[in-house]
UniProtKB/Swiss-Prot annotation:
Signal sequence, start to end: none
Entry keyword set: Magnesium, Metal-binding, Thiamine biosynthesis, Transferase
Cofactor: Mg(2+)
PANTHER family linked to this entry: THIAMINE-PHOSPHATE PYROPHOSPHORYLASE (PTHR20857), THIAMINE-PHOSPHATE SYNTHASE (PTHR20857:SF15)
Pathway: Cofactor biosynthesis; thiamine diphosphate biosynthesis; thiamine phosphate from 4-amino-2-methyl-5-diphosphomethylpyrimidine and 4-methyl-5-(2-phosphoethyl)-thiazole: step 1/1
GO biological process: thiamine biosynthetic process; thiamine diphosphate biosynthetic process
List of residues binding 4-amino-2-methyl-5-(diphosphooxymethyl)pyrimidine: 65-69, 97, 136, 166
Residues binding 2-[(2R,5Z)-2-carboxy-4-methylthiazol-5(2H)-ylidene]ethyl phosphate, per UniProt: 163-165, 192, 212-213
Listed name of the protein: Thiamine-phosphate synthase
Amino acid sequence: MEVSSIGSFQEHIDKTTDIVTLHPLLRNPIMPQPRGIYLITPDETDTARLIAHTAPLLNGIVWLQYRNKLANTALRTEQAQALLALCRPTGIPLLINDDLELAQTIGADGVHLGMHDSNASIARAQLGPHAIIGVSCYNQIERAKQAIKAGASYVGFGAFYPSHTKTTPYRATPELLRQTTHLGVPRVAIGGLTPKNIAPIIEAGAELLAVISGIYSAKNPITALKAYQSQFNI
């Protein structure tokens, strides 16, 4: 995997004049909904390598989610803290996958909850009114409605295509996105997304595309990220 130098990323940080502790989206509810790439980290056990691979990508994403199903508690804490330190100067929100306690401990910007995790109301109570709370809703519109009612900031649908990262029996379709335009929160599409197959999903209304291996496992992750962005016209 080719990873560009983090020099350009550091230059971006150096030019940042307003260092925020909370993403503007969280402080200003009248701002437009986020639209673009929602990057999710891979199961990387080397923290330095994780940071080196992630840093050059931050300029092109909307949100970052820390997800590592192989790490123990100590490593997860170490990596989450390192990613938070990386994200804060840029204003990119960091969410934690499936670990409400870790999100609260490090002061992350939010949490993403799956099928068997704490519900959105518990997460909202623990993380506060400004946290970004996402819920996996698979292909279930009613689950999405209940999640939003419980306090979810966004809902995730998928898998849209077969995925090697996370297998699931659920299949979502562009029609599902067209049926959920009324939900009033960002909808995240996930599952086997590539620059060649995302056009129908974007056209159907997905505000965010969640990607892991399509970017991190690419020969050139920055080039891959730009390919996704080009489909979003951003």
